[in-house]
């Protein structure tokens, strides 16, 4: 049985988890959380997006933030705000420890991945990565006006999946999460 969970949401209000690790990878790996899932008969935990993501400017202008994580900017990095240490880079070790804890409990870890768009938005969005490297190789552009993005995702852009560059990026990312981070599977958004 697969249990879908949000890293922050699963433990943020859980009084059985120490306050300093609630809403983090360490909190998700806390023994009482894993025991609860085992009692339910869960065999795999599916984590909602955990790739590094950014906040949308329109949310920030309203005093809000991107809770769900569907605005990816780093396909090879676990989101650093989910690290209990607060140190950049420590999220990798904490994520790996969480995966090990689930494997020791006989459960698999599945990631909800978002490879159909990025946080760079439309032509007015920020230049954070692929726009600056090779815009036309990574994004679907409007045929008669290549300044604008062909948006099939409702986010301002869509990755160009038939591009060898985009396809290589995605397969390299998937391989990384399996070989280096030891996850067991994926759900594609």
Mark where each language-model region is.
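Basic K/R-rich, polyanion-interacting modules in nucleoproteins and related proteins
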Residues: 1
């Amino acid at each position: 049985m697969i249990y879908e969970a949000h890293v922050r949401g699963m433990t943020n209000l859980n009084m059985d988890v120490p306050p300093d690790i609630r809403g983090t990878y360490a909190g998700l790996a806390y023994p009482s959380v894993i025991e609860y899932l085992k009692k339910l008969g869960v065999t795999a935990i599916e984590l909602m997006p955990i790739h590094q993501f950014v906040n949308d400017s329109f949310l920030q202008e309203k005093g809000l933030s991107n809770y769900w994580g569907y605005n990816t900017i780093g396909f090879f990095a676990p989101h650093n705000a989910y690290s209990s240490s607060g140190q950049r880079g420590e999220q990798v070790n904490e994520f790996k420890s969480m995966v090990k804890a689930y494997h020791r409990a006989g459960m698999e870890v599945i990631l909800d991945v978002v490879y159909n768009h990025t946080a760079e938005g439309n032509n007015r969005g920020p230049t954070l990565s692929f726009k600056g490297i090779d815009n036309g190789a990574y994004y679907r552009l409007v045929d008669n006006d290549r300044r604008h993005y062909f948006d099939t995702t409702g986010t301002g852009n869509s990755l160009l999946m038939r591009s060898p560059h985009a396809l290589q990026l995605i397969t390299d990312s998937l391989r990384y999460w399996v070989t280096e981070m030891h996850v067991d599977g994926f759900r594609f958004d």
